[in-house]
A protein has these predicted regions:
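Short acidic alpha-helix that forms the nucleotide-activated donor recognition element
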Residues: 103-114
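Short hydrophobic signal-anchor/transmembrane segments that target glycosyltransferases
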Residues: 32-49
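Conserved donor-binding/catalytic core segment of Leloir-type glycosyltransferases
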Residues: 13-29, 36, 55-56
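Nucleotide-sugar donor-binding and catalytic loop/hinge architecture
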Residues: 2-20, 47-50
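Extended catalytic-interface subdomain
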Residues: 1-2, 107
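Catalytic binding pocket for nucleotide-activated donors in carbohydrate/polymer assembly enzymes
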Residues: 44-56, 112, 116-184
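Nucleotide-activated donor-binding/catalytic signature segment of Leloir-type glycosyltransferases, i.e.
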Residues: 59-105
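A conserved amphipathic alpha-helix that caps or lines the catalytic cleft of carbohydrate-
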Residues: 39-43, 80, 134
Length: 184
């Protein structure tokens, strides 16, 4: 399949599906398995969002020579497969997963195109993805940032919906809040 950042793919993002973007290194500090589990629990709790939302998870592998990172990669692949097989329909799958890195030039249009960005760091410094997502937004059609309270940027980005990346209910309700704020 084509990378999410491909301009042809960007044009195909339809207004009928709310797109949620998550982009980071495949690293245990980024809270990827926790986000995926919360996303599955969200779909279970709010089935009215089936076929109405899609998570674009971009996870660039790093340190794959280290066994714990290999195990994390396998865990993420397994979760994506399980969630997609549980909830997918003939015309929709809940998670699009990509490991190909995205260039900065392609990331900016992707930030503008996706209605929600979800940064779920378990522990993080400033987290530039959160700041870049906010900076890339068009004032007339700004996206919504779901941000881990453990990201350093959480203290500066007051407009973000803050979530606890270790608490499923916090993430589920943060996503619900973001979705009810987006223009449907």
């Amino acid at each position: 399949s084509q990378p999410l950042s491909d301009p042809a793919v960007l044009k195909n993002l339809t207004s009928t599906i709310t797109t949620i973007l998550a982009v980071e290194r495949l690293d245990y500090t980024k809270g990827i398995p926790e986000r995926l589990q919360a996303f599955a629990a969200f779909l279970q709790r709010y089935p009215q969002y089936l076929e109405r939302i899609q998570l674009y998870q971009i996870a660039c592998p790093s340190r794959l020579d280290i066994q714990t990172y290999q195990q994390l990669r396998q865990q993420v692949h397994t979760l994506v497969e399980q969630i997609n097989s549980q909830f997918a329909t003939a015309s929709w799958q809940p998670i699009i997963y990509q490991e190909d890195p995205v260039s900065h030039d392609n990331l900016m249009p992707l930030f503008r195109q996706c209605q929600i960005c979800w940064v779920n760091s378990l522990k993080d410094g400033m987290n530039l993805v959160a700041k870049e997502y906010i900076a890339a937004q068009d004032e007339q059609n700004a996206g919504i940032l779901i941000l881990s309270k453990n990201a350093g940027a959480a203290h500066q980005l007051q407009q973000a919906i803050l979530v606890d990346p270790t608490n499923n209910d916090s993430m589920i309700e943060g996503l619900y809040q973001a979705l009810t704020m987006t223009k449907q």
